[in-house]
Amino acid sequence: MNTLVLLLISIAVLFCGYVFYGSWIARQWGVNEGNRPTPAHTMEDGVDYVPAKAPILMGHHFSSIAGAGPITGPIGAAMFGWLPVTLWVLIGGIFFGGVHDFGALFASIRHQGKSIGEIISLNMSKKAKQLFIIFSYLTLILVVAAFAAIVASTFGATYKDGVLDMAASATKASVAMVSIMFILIAIIFGFAVYRRHTPMVISSILGVGAIVLCMAIGMNFHPFYFSMNTWMVLVGIYITIASVTPVWILLQPRDYLSSFLLYAMLIVAIIGIVGAHPTIDEKVFPAFAGFTINNANGTQFLFPILFTTVACGAISGFHSLVSSGTTSKQLDKESDAKPIAYGGMLLECVLAIITLCAIGYARVTGHTHGATDIFAGGIAAMVAAIPGFEGLKNIMYTLLVLTYSAFCLTSLDTATRLARFMFQEFWLEPGENPKDVKDGFRKLMVNPYFATIITVILGISLGMGGFAKIWGLFGAANQLLAAIGLLAVAAWLGNAGKNNKMFLFPMSFMLLVTICSLSLIVKNQIGIIMAGAAGWGPYAQVIIGSLLVILALILAVEGYRTIAHPRKETEINH
């Protein structure tokens, strides 16, 4: 298969899905009926609830949901071949992930910008909400740990026998320097747009120009050669500040500017694919490698492993937390929900397909050292294969690594803010706001600074202490979040008298996938324990995996009961 043909077919399919299926869903739910004001306006507080222009919010939303997922997911699932991954990305994105993200955002804005947990409480039960929040919070802690470690490893200098390896560390130091300057530019951009009311076009042009200048400076001046552990601490301090800072100061402008890095990355990738249009070599990257694959991690089954590994490239539970956690509090108009949520998911599918194209060429050119090298190396090598572009490989590689790091950093502080919301929400009664709490203990628990500090300490400690030992659970846990998100929105739509049939198969399928995946993980880890070669990781995975299966079953029973017997109550938001 030629990579250009694969990309064009995929874009055409996704475009049709957006125009036809996405529009049908919007009509079924009554999106934008009556021109309702969104929570960003009715509950504006200048910190979390702040209306944002659609391009800025699209930048935040996409940068937050993308992270490393649409790159690492397809790379991990590529062991089964490019065809099954492509089919799942296209089908999953249109009928699963897009519906999930759009539904979560729409449900949240009809519930005053509340999270999926609060929607579960109002439409299912308080017990279901508490279970969901505990599960979501623990999953977010794992996300914070993993992304903090990824960012720190991207920045951290390489030491050999205690001596700094300058040559091996130069690119990392460049990425770190550019990232630091990028944060400062974002703050200036935020003040220019929201306080000085500088026109968006002028601000964007100056912002993009500043990013280019930052890259030029960072590639030639990079004085910070800190170790990975030092960067972990510094990243922890950064996300502590970022998650309690008003969104207009840092989160909105930085994510908006990050979106230009994404567009640059997509343009570079498309130039590489169009210009070089290499054919995928079936010998190194077959269309279909089989239903079972044996590798260093044992026997891998296409079902359910494919559907939990691709993750963000087709559907991801983390997206529902972003949609209902930060995006819904910044949505300016209901009509923006479809392009931002449904369109954002399909754009992520395009990135997943580009990743598949990169894998095929990376395996030919020898870029096989981890997800970052596979993606950046594959795309950069394609660009360098175009006549006249041979000298751009190193520049393109650095740009792509920087973009990858920027996405991880964006997802990291969004995840920290979401975890703070979850921690606070656990202690609140339905409909109660943190400012209303007078009780001493609960007042401490819902304090945003206390909630953030606890979250960061747990996340950074796990990141420094071996999150990889339980990372195997993340794929299944993330997809379980997606199944529960689908379940919650379907329950609300049923209670509100709206069509929820488009949720029934996706949520049932994802529940089946996650329960099977978790059961396989538990079985494999028990085998490791019985073999007598286990540290604490396998024990933790068995315990957590078993609890997640029980949680999935409890929430499934509650959800299906609600869907089967919807309650038309006056407090349900229509």
Q: What name fits each language-model region?
A:
Residues 1-17, 207-258, 271-275, 300, ...:
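A generic transmembrane alpha-helix motif of multi-pass inner-membrane proteins
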Residues 123-141, 343-350, 392-396, 425-464:
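Loop-to-transmembrane helix boundary motifs in multi-pass membrane proteins
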Residues 16-71, 259, 301, 305:
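Membrane-interface "cap" regions at the ends of multi-pass membrane proteins
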Residues 52-111, 122-126, 143, 148-159, ...:
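Membrane-interface helix-loop-helix modules in multi-pass membrane proteins
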Residues 23-50, 73-76, 86, 90, ...:
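Flexible loop linkers connecting adjacent transmembrane helices
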